[in-house]
Design a protein with these regions (language model features):
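Activation segment signature within eukaryotic-like protein kinase domains
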Residues: 114-115
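Conserved short submotifs of the Hanks-type protein kinase catalytic core
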Residues: 81-95, 99
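Conserved catalytic-loop aspartate of Hanks-type protein kinases
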Residues: 230
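Conserved activation segment of eukaryotic-like protein kinases, specifically the C-terminal portion
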Residues: 204-218
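AlphaC helix of the eukaryotic protein kinase fold
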Residues: 42-64
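Activation-segment/catalytic-loop signature of the eukaryotic protein kinase fold
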Residues: 77
Length: 384
């Protein structure tokens, strides 16, 4: 059955108060995409609700214009049958939340891949986006006399442009990150609550974010939200993929019965309680995923330090933006192994020991099966 005259509905991906997201196939062109469709009908292109939708999309189009591989590609918004719609790439995969729930323990190379891809994507929003959004005439940027395709931007001007054009995602959580099935790469989704230059991209400036990922300052005053609020939520994501769970757990049943009380408890956690150390939780996740093996710490101490700095209660004690997080991670990764982890050789030897124990156990099980098969065959021969 045709949907909005152009699409075949495949299934609902998600639904919120403002819009529903469908997986669809274009009837004539055959491509498969996701489309965000407003729940409420609008009268025409002059309807304030549609204009608000367009304002949201203006920045989102520049963020998700296909220039960054780890940000979902967004296409031109339109009005069809009195519904505001915008197409975006359909990401065939699972959410980070689903991935962690399935794996229990995420291998360290996957943790670093997540850090490389999602932290870099957020750094693009917090910092590099000015290169695509700035207007040389409005921003009074001079061209390079030796190369008219380039601009002369000193450090002070760059910082002004970063402050003006930085986009705060404002809704980072593990259901807004996807892991592609075909190559395992991570993709950042849903900028519907994004904020630029202190103003909500979407007309509704409601405080954004899932409770487990909200920075302490968000509970007090949504007007103080900045890139450092995103850094806190990013720290929760990094903590979650390394530890196998978020630092502060929300009791779903308590939230359903009394969301106000549960929300207040979560606020107290974020404001007052230090995050639990990561290693015991990572050990627990490892043992759940690998019950016959011995856990050995497999990540450098500096990684936990980076995460804990992201999770500082005071925004001033965090990184200023995701670019600083990304640069710090890359700096540590580029250090020589001897300075990164004094116990790396011992850890490698212990892993080999674990592998040998596992293979020995598997071989023993195989021999038992062979013996049982042999005994069964002898018994059958005796009967014959």
């Amino acid at each position: 059955m045709a949907f909005l005259n152009e699409y075949d509905k495949l299934n609902i991906i998600g639904k919120g108060g403002f819009a529903t997201i469908w997986k669809v196939r274009h009837i004539k062109l055959g491509y498969v995409r996701a489309i965000k469709v407003s729940n409420e009908m609008v009268e025409d292109e002059n309807d304030p609700a549609y204009q608000s939708f367009l304002n949201e999309c203006k920045v989102l189009l520049k963020i998700g214009n296909g220039s960054h591989p780890n940000i979902v590609h967004i296409y031109q918004p339109r009005l069809i049958e009195n519904r505001a719609i915008v197409e975006m790439d359909y990401v065939d995969g699972e959410t980070l939340n689903e991935y962690i729930a399935r794996k229990h323990f995420v291998p360290i190379d996957e943790v670093f891949r997540f850090a490389d891809e999602i932290v870099r994507a957020l750094a693009y929003c917090h910092y590099d986006i000015y290169k695509f959004l700035m207007d040389p005439n409005v921003d009074n940027i001079k061209s390079d006399p030796n190369d008219g395709r380039k601009y002369i931007i000193d450090k002070a001007t760059e910082q002004e442009l970063v402050a003006k054009y930085a986009v705060t995602h404002n809704d980072l959580h593990s259901n807004n990150v996807m892991r592609r099935n075909y190559d395992g790469s991570f993709v950042l989704l849903d900028f519907g609550l994004a904020i630029q230059n202190g103003k909500a991209v979407k007309s509704s400036s409601r405080r954004g974010g899932a409770l487990e990922y909200m920075s302490p300052e968000k509970f007090d005053d949504s007007s103080v939200i900045s890139t450092q609020s995103d850094v806190y939520s990013l720290g929760i994501l990094l903590y979650e993929i390394l530890a196998g769970r978020v630092p502060f757990l929300l009791d779903d049943k308590a939230y359903e019965s009394n969301p106000t009380v549960a929300g207040f408890e979560m606020m107290k956690f974020h404001k007052e309680t230090p995050p639990p150390p990561i290693e015991p939780l990572r050990r627990e996740a490892f043992e759940k995923a690998n019950p016959r093996q011995t856990y050995i710490k497999d990540y450098p101490e500096w990684l936990e330090n980076v995460i804990m700095r992201c999770l500082a209660k005071n925004p001033a004690e965090r990184y200023a933006n995701a670019k600083e997080v990304f640069d710090d991670i890359q700096k540590h990764k580029s250090e020589k192994p001897s300075t990164r982890d004094d116990n790396s050789l011992l850890n490698d030897l212990e892993r080999l020991k674990n592998d040998n124990q596992r293979l020995a156990a598997e071989n023993e099980e195989l021999y038992k099966r062979i013996e049982n098969t042999s005994d069964t065959n002898m018994s059958l021969n005796d009967q014959i």
